[in-house]
Amino acid sequence: MALENVTICGVFLVPEKERNMSEIRFSSKEHEKFFYQMLAKCGKHDSYYSSFFYCVGISEDTRNHVDRMFDFKERLIKPEALHEGWQTGGSARLTRLAFNLWNGYVEKGEESLSTPYEMFDCGYAPYFYEAIRMKYPEYCRELPQAVSYTHLR
């Protein structure tokens, strides 16, 4: 799909080459290895599995406890994992996003913890965008680069 030049509110939008959706940014080699191992283990490569295991793989804590978070036999998330002793503030954010991307899960009574205001307030935020992009590839394309032309007036 070709993007066109557009002017909005005095800003000239210059289309950039659309990002190749196969370019995945990982937090570490361990993250990348885990991601591909989990997809192979499940035999699924759809947006549900990809976004879930991408999130879970970001942190060593969540990678080490994937069996506490996901039932591989039934292919279901385990919400009780949010309250286990191994969880940290960061791993709980990863878990909440992974669960939400899996099936829209939001913990009753703790809905505010699943808002971007709470979840993205950590160093994992750049990787959260990648997970969202995996879940919704049809909607997550690179936006055109904005170039101001006010100096031309």
Predicted regions and their residues:
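Conserved small/polar residues in nucleotide/adenosyl-binding loops
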Residues: 150-151
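Extended, charge-biased low-complexity segments
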Residues: 2, 6-7, 12-85, 107-118, ...
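Short, surface-exposed beta-edge/turn micro-motifs
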Residues: 94-95
